[in-house]
Amino acid sequence: MKGCLATMDKELWIERANDSLVKHFYEQQSDIEQREGFESKLTFGTAGIRGKFGLGEGRLNKFTIEKLALGLARYLNAQTNSPTIVIHYDIRHLSTEFAQIIANVLANHQITVYLPDTYKTTPELSFAVRNLNTTAGIMITASHNPKDYNGIKVYGSDGAQLSTDASELASRYIEEVGDPLQIDIPISKQNTSYIKPFPKSVTDDYMKHIQNMIGYIPKSDLQVVFTSLHGTSVPIVPELLQSLNFNQFNLVEAQCKPDPNFSSVQSANPEDHRAFDQAVELANKSHADLLISTDPDADRLGIAERDAHGHITYFNGNQIGALLLNYRIQQTSQLRHRLMIQSIVSSELTKSLARYNNVEYKEVLTGFKFIAQEIRQLDDHQNMIFAFEESYGFLSEPFVRDKDAVQIVPLIIKYASELKLYGKTLKDELEQIYQTVGRHEDTLFSHTLDGLEGKKKIESIMTHFRSNPPQEIQGLKVKAIEDYLTSEVYHLDKDTTSQINSPKSNVIRVLFDEGFIALRPSGTEPKIKLYVSLKCRNFDDVAQKINAMIFS
């Protein structure tokens, strides 16, 4: 019976394929990919919805987007009278169409919608929610995922992604909508009057906030290469740099045009060195010093540096975080009660740097919304000078409540330009940080363990650390084990336990005098990540042995 219903369901979807907006994507998929769309459902989680295009409730299409929008409309109307919302969208396939569908559904429920006529960055959406004082915001993007993906992120009135409680409530409203093929969305002129043009003044205000933050970029002979990886950071980043009288940059022209197919990049992820391939070619031709890339929705940023001999140094997210924190400490020396915020899997290096400079630090769960929650709870006398995640997400000033590569681009250029005046580089500055607080190094191992056996393996690893906490790992004495699922810390050196004041998450962190390792399974994929952050000899060898010991 169940198989018959599934077949009927598939036939109904195929009958509506011409109206789905995704027929072309569906026809290009394998039989397995097509079947997955009918055998699963998209779920609205803490980061919204992200998935492939295709037919069925497990894929993004006109009907599943209408279901999402209708659920969100009911959620917003239940929260407040006369809600308002701003929608932004990136350059991906169907981002514009999805934005219009969502706007129409929300307008149909008397929700005022601010909708731009062109693509925007994620940090601009966060800023716009705060600037326009709207009830919520929606960003249509799938960050650096492949070209056949898209997604919807929902933001609250503070410009941060919805809290866990709010996203769970919104999810219930979405699920109550039922079958997406049964939704009827009447459109009338009266309803479309709720859709308003997005004010240009908001973009101007965003630019002014960054200009005020930067002040000026000192004149040096620093040369920069920039790539948007076909994403949204062009034209806003070049316009911003020019407004700061910095013109010593070259764009990777082929990659600085919006392209939903990401035609000229092997990877649209600034964490991946391959994302810099064309930037390196241009840097070698133009003798550039600094290479910068942003991901497609411009919330994350990667950098590399070219020396006089043409050697390229790539900086990981923790190293960029350390450099930016170091610079922000220098810039804010006149402030008291300074605070830095980072995720629990980010480096010991930045914590050591903060301690050395008498800067308070706080650690939060992974996900920038947790950083935003800390910012929201700041006392009046506290000054947040920097926040970051090791996954290349940074924030210098909190007029935005999400990762913001747009504000970081001119900041890192200003830093590099100042260093160039003294004949120094970012690599030199990082080495100085190591000499000051110690050579804390970091690496990440990501394991995909498919199938039932893979799931059991992941559960077994986490259970082992919980029930049989190791006394030492590769000669490193364990001080404590933090379990964010039980909200407990077991202090092995004292044989005591204490509580963690944090939302629950399936993460275990093992602490040593030399640093930590952390284990974090994915909640949606058959993956588990091992983070290693240590100050020790032969770091690479030690990290590899720890990885082999856990996953052998």
Swiss-Prot record:
PROSITE patterns: PGM_PMM (PS00710). It is an enzyme of class 5 (isomerase). GO terms for biological process: enterobacterial common antigen biosynthetic process; glucose metabolic process; purine ribonucleoside salvage. It catalyses: alpha-D-glucose 1-phosphate = alpha-D-glucose 6-phosphate. Its cofactor is Mg(2+). Disulfide bonds: none annotated. Pathway: Glycolipid metabolism; diglucosyl-diacylglycerol biosynthesis. GO terms for molecular function: magnesium ion binding; phosphoglucomutase activity; phosphopentomutase activity. Keywords: Carbohydrate metabolism, Glucose metabolism, Isomerase, Magnesium, Metal-binding, Phosphoprotein. Mg(2+) binds at residues 143, 295, 297, 299. Its EC number is 5.4.2.2. The active site is at 143 (phosphoserine intermediate). Binds 1 Mg(2+) ion per subunit. It comes from the Bacteria. Catalyzes the interconversion between glucose-6-phosphate and alpha-glucose-1-phosphate. This is the first step in the biosynthesis of diglucosyl-diacylglycerol (Glc2-DAG), i.e. the predominant glycolipid found in the S.aureus membrane, which is also used as a membrane anchor for lipoteichoic acid (LTA). Belongs to the phosphohexose mutase family. This is Phosphoglucomutase.
